[in-house]
Structures are given as C-alpha cells and as structure tokens.
Amino acid sequence: MHINVGSVHEREQIEQLAELTGEAERYGLPVLAMTYARGPDIDPEADDYNQAVGHAVRLGEELGADVVKTGYTGDAESFQHVVESTSLPVVIAGGSKGTDEETLSMVRGAMDAGASGVSMGRSIFQHDEPEKIARAVASVVHDDAEAEAALREAGLAVEA
C-alpha cells in the first residue's frame, strides 16, 4: 500500500492505508507502507524536499504502518531528517536506474543517515547480474561496506 503525499489521490490513499492497517492489526500482520512526496506541487529539486518526504514517512507511522519505504532525498544529511521524522524503521526504494556505484552510494548515504535497510525491486531483479548486485547491497547494509569496496567484493566493475 502506498501514499503519495501531494498527489491528487492523496486523500483516497490515506483512507485506504488507514483501512488496511486496521485490518492488518486484527490479523497480527505487519504493514510496510510506501510513503512518497509526489504531486503537482512537489519539487524533488527544492531545498525543502526532505521536509515533504519526512512528512510522508511520519504520516505512514500515524496511519499505523510498521515499516516505511520511501525515496532517497539525494544525500545523507537531508535524508537524516526523513529518518528522524518517524520512530519506525525506514527503508529506501531502489530509485531510478543509475550505475551500480550510484545505487550503492545511495544505499551507503541512507545507511549513514540512519535508515534500517532497503526494499529494492527492479534495481536488483532487472540487473544484468542480480546475485552480484544483491550481494553488494547486502554488504553495504549489513557489513557497513563503502560502495566501491562492495562492488569489488561482489565482482562488479567499478566505474573509472
């Protein structure tokens, strides 16, 4: 279930997430809410974009989620605000397609900001070598590896 704070569908998405978390609680099921700041008045390039993302993850908590997934805001300093906006574990989405080093640098920045991990799909399963990139991501998340070292250890090329 996801909410796009700032979208034209925000109200319905909030209602749906609230309903889902209520039902999930009845059955003892955890909920991962995908919480994003997206919409006509949301500018990902704005200096205060991390405030909007922080609001989105906090809203996920207030609506009963157990874990929130969101997009990385571009650097560890701005993402730290996002992580500090909630008491829930925060995991990042894979984001737009980039180089392996860009992906792992994003993961490194999120972890440095206090994120709990990642929830990646296409960044892994559409990769030419999904096992290797998954190993590299795991190395950053679980072994505190730097991006370049994780690439080398996984047997992936490091861009020059």
PLM feature segments, named:
Residues 1-90, 98-116, 120, 139, ...:
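Alpha/beta enzyme core
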Residues 96-97, 124:
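Glycine-rich beta-alpha junction loops
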Residues 157-160:
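C-terminal extensions of enzymes
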Residues 122-128:
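A short, acidic, flexible beta-alpha connecting loop/helix-capping segment that sits on the rim
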Residues 103-104, 128-137:
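Histidine/acidic-residue-rich catalytic or RNA/ligand-binding cores of hydrolases
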